[in-house]
Amino acid sequence: MAAARPSLGRVLPGSSVLFLCDMQEKFRHNIAYFPQIVSVAARMLKVARLLEVPVMLTEQYPQGLGPTVPELGTEGLRPLAKTCFSMVPALQQELDSRPQLRSVLLCGIEAQACILNTTLDLLDRGLQVHVVVDACSSRSQVDRLVALARMRQSGAFLSTSEGLILQLVGDAVHPQFKEIQKLIKEPAPDSGLLGLFQGQNSLLH
């Protein structure tokens, strides 16, 4: 089978990895739509486990910002602590060990900080980045909107969780489809995205 052209942004389980960025206790009451984005990220994690997509988890200065929130469901994953506003330096060794890697699916916070800088670092490495828009947020909706627009300008793909999940599973005859169907039976919770995409002045037009 011919390889997908990079410009199409196709995602396949065998050449993808899921990044979970800094969804920690101290952010719980400050990030817009925090419960909703964690819920969607948890859904992405469950799908990644079903499809054997590798998962990488970071925590920003956990001594001060606390551990990853339990509802993300990261049991069995070893979080990597960092202070840099990018996941890439902490995950450099993991990335280098995966020559088949083409696509990174990115969830977490904050959009204008660690998500943006992680995206730029990954693009610099020649990887495709799929920002899971319903699993990324910021304290400020303005920062969130501008960061999404900035990442798109730089060459990242903006995708919804369900769109990526269905790309990964690929076919209703997939042996894991029935389990995945249970996860997406209910639409992803509203995380304020519709208002960001509406209006004549939207930066995402």
From Swiss-Prot:
Subcellular localization, as worded in the UniProt entry: Cytoplasm; Nucleus
Positions in coiled-coil regions: none
Keyword Metal-binding: no
GO cellular component, one term: cytoplasm
Residue numbers carrying Phosphoserine: S7, S202
Pfam families registered for this protein in UniProt: Isochorismatase (PF00857)
CDD domains named in the record: YcaC_related (cd01012)
Keyword terms: Cytoplasm, Nucleus, Phosphoprotein
Family annotation (InterPro entries): Isochorismatase-like_dom, Isochorismatase-like_sf, Isochorismatase_domain
Entry's Gene Ontology BP terms: protein destabilization
Keyword Iron belongs to the record: no
Subunit and interaction comment: Interacts with CDKN2A.
PANTHER family: HYDROLASE, ISOCHORISMATASE DOMAIN-CONTAINING PROTEIN 2
Protein family (similarity comment): Belongs to the isochorismatase family.
Protein name: Isochorismatase domain-containing protein 2
Organism this protein belongs to: Homo sapiens
